[in-house]
Every structure is written in C-alpha cells, then in structure tokens.
Amino acid sequence: MKVLINKNELNKILKKLNNVIVSNNKMKPYHSYLLIEATEKEINFYANNEYFSAKCTLAENIDVLEEGEVIVKGKIFSELINGIKEDIITIQEKDQTLLVKTKKTNINLNTIDKKEFPRIRFNQNVDLKEFDELKIQHSLLTKGLKKIAHAVSTFRESTRKFNGVNFNGSNGKQIFLEASDSYKLSVYEIKQKTDPFNFIVETNLLSFINSFNPEGGDLISIFFRKEHKDDLSTELLIKLDNFLINYTSINESFPRVMQLFDFEPETKVTIQKNELKDALQRILTLAQNERFFLCDMQVTNSHLKINSNVQNIGASLEEVTCLKFEGHKLNIAVNALSLLEHIDSFDTDEIELYFQGSNKYFLISSNNEPELKEILVPSK
C-alpha cells in the first residue's frame, strides 16, 4: 500500500476515530488499532470498540499509488499525524512496517498481522433494501440527546436498557427519545411521522454521533432491521457525512413511560429555573457535590423551602419564590443533584412542578418548552 494524502483531511478523520478507539483495553487489544485500506479510488479507515464499529471513506485529496491495507496503533498514529506540519503526507506499507513520510519527516511504525484482528472490519456490503430507514435532522437529534443524557444510568446495569436512550417511534406520529435510570426519567419529543419502530442505543455511540458537525447536510440516516436469527437484536447502520457506523441493539423492552405523564396533580407550582438552580448549587457545594445527597423540600403557597444538613459540615435553608401556586402544601424529600440536572436541561426560565403528593413521583415541564418532560421519584 502506498498513498499520498492531505494532512488536514486525514487529521479530521483521525480526530473522529479517536472517539472510537480504546487505547488501554488489554483484554481486547484490537480495540486500540486502526485499519487503513487503500483501493483504486478511495481510502477506508476502520475502528471499533465493544459497542460499535465505524468506517470512514476518503475519496478526495488523495492519490492511491499502490492498493493494500495495514493495521497500526490508532492513538499513536493519530498523534504523529497531528504533529506533522507539511500539507502532503506519504503513507506506505513495506515489510510489515508503515512508513509515514514528508519532505522533512520519516517515521516507521510497527504494524499488526491482519489475521489477528478479524473483527476490526464489519460487513458493510449489505442490501439496504432489507432495512427500514429513519431520516432525522442531526441538529434536532443532538439537541434532544443532550437534554436527556443526564437521566441515563451511569452504572453498568445488568439490563442494558438503562445504559442508553430508547428511540420510540411506536405510534408513527412522533419520535420520543427516552432515558431513565429508574429513579429519574427524561423524554424529548420530536414531531415527525415515521413507520413504527423501537430500539435502544448505548450512550457511547450517541456521544460519537453528538461529536459531529455535519458537512454534507443536516440529515442523518439510520437504517435498522431485526436480526432474523433470533429477533433478540436489531442491527443498525448509521450514515453521517462520510462515516458508516455499525451497531447492534439488544431488543430489551424499555418501560412504557408515556402513561406516567397523565395524572391529575394535587399541587402545581411555577418557579424561576435559575433561582432554584442557584439554590441547589449552593446546597451541593455544602454537601461537597455528593451524588446521592438528599434534601427536604417544603412546598408552600409562597416558597419552596429546601432544608439540607451535612454531618460535621453544616446546614442550610434555601427559599425559592413560587410565581404561581395551586393545590395543597406538602413536604417531599429529593435527590439534590438529580433535581438540578433535570431543571438545568430546560432553556426557558420558568418551569412548572406537578406533585401527586409526598410519596409519589413528580413531573417537571415548561409551557415554553413542551417537547421536554421529566420525572423524579422522591427519596425516602
């Protein structure tokens, strides 16, 4: 293999693939490598991790002098390319070594036998007619994902459904992005008619998708089909710019959460988001940002009164003004960080809290941002 390639174009690809490569996985070392494949008219780059595989194709600003393929350490190769100043780079495979050359630089990198890492390349020669296709605006998708990402479980659950986002298009009229750790729930609605579908995508892949700033238009294509072998998984192929991403979603049943929003509240209050946010941040500072710190919240017709007590450090009382109040007074215990993450995902300043009582989950929403709804379970 021997190719001439523009350094800036190569650098852009490698920066993206660095988000795929895992450099310190001793159990699965092939996750730290990058496969470079030169064909007559293009160069393909492959990388994978335990969650998904990615292929990037470059067909411009290249000159393929000799076809071939080579596997190298991904992070090291990326850092070396980033440090080169010249615009044109020669990459050549020779005697199980990768030569990286410019007018002023000559680098030899050891390569790996391709037979040792058969899973680094996924089968992209599939008939897309066998797949259903979902086209969605990348900007709208990433906006929704960023708003609900905090609700995804940060623990590696025995069931993977809480380690990702559920794409719920089951009614064919909207797409609901749903995330939960079983204590908090966030749902973002995208108004778009589709054929019915439902699948879960791990946050590792969603973070990779969020890292893109599409150059070829704002649409992202997600092709999906249930695996015919067992119906226990759904195969996804995602096209974004010159990247093709392969992912297998395990068909676990995500809870039916939309019905949770349909209740008659006993108490409803309207508050300024930033006032509550500032109060919670002070409480968490006192609690030294303890993730599971609980505080008591008294809901009155004039204020939310939030009491917190940190052993051996101190105590605080925060009062947040109620702009509107309907219903009954109540006391409820909440996780301070979870409540902060929930309200901070809203862009609007006024938010509404809907309570069913002291021992039931409550709803957080905004009339100015109706596409986002969140639920928090009280703590005991």
Curated annotation (Swiss-Prot):
The UniProt entry, under InterPro entries, shows: DNA_clamp_sf, DNA_polIII_beta, DNA_polIII_beta_C, DNA_polIII_beta_N
Q: Where in the cell is it found?
A: Cytoplasm
Does Cytoplasm show up as a keyword for this record? yes
GO function terms (MF aspect): 3'-5' exonuclease activity; DNA binding; DNA-directed DNA polymerase activity
The record's SMART domains line, in alphabetical order, gives:
POL3Bc
Q: Which UniProt keywords apply?
A: Cytoplasm, DNA replication, DNA-binding, DNA-directed DNA polymerase, Nucleotidyltransferase, Transferase
- Pfam families from the entry? DNA_pol3_beta (PF00712), DNA_pol3_beta_3 (PF02768)
Q: What is its main location?
A: cytoplasm
**Gene3D superfamilies noted in UniProt:** 3.70.10.10, DNA Polymerase III, subunit A, domain 2 (3.10.150.10)
- What does the record list as GO biological process? DNA strand elongation involved in DNA replication
Judging by the UniProt lineage, the source's domain of life is Bacteria
**Gene Ontology cellular-component terms listed:** cytoplasm; DNA polymerase III complex
Spell out the subunit comment: Forms a ring-shaped head-to-tail homodimer around DNA which binds and tethers DNA polymerases and other proteins to the DNA. The DNA replisome complex has a single clamp-loading complex (3 tau and 1 each of delta, delta', psi and chi subunits) which binds 3 Pol III cores (1 core on the leading strand and 2 on the lagging strand) each with a beta sliding clamp dimer. Additional proteins in the replisome are other copies of gamma, psi and chi, Ssb, DNA helicase and RNA primase.
Q: Which family does it belong to?
A: Belongs to the beta sliding clamp family.
Protein role: Confers DNA tethering and processivity to DNA polymerases and other proteins. Acts as a clamp, forming a ring around DNA (a reaction catalyzed by the clamp-loading complex) which diffuses in an ATP-independent manner freely and bidirectionally along dsDNA. Initially characterized for its ability to contact the catalytic subunit of DNA polymerase III (Pol III), a complex, multichain enzyme responsible for most of the replicative synthesis in bacteria; Pol III exhibits 3'-5' exonuclease proofreading activity.
Could you tell me what this protein is called? Beta sliding clamp
Q: What is the lineage of its organism?
A: Bacteria, Bacillati, Mycoplasmatota, Mycoplasmoidales, Mycoplasmoidaceae
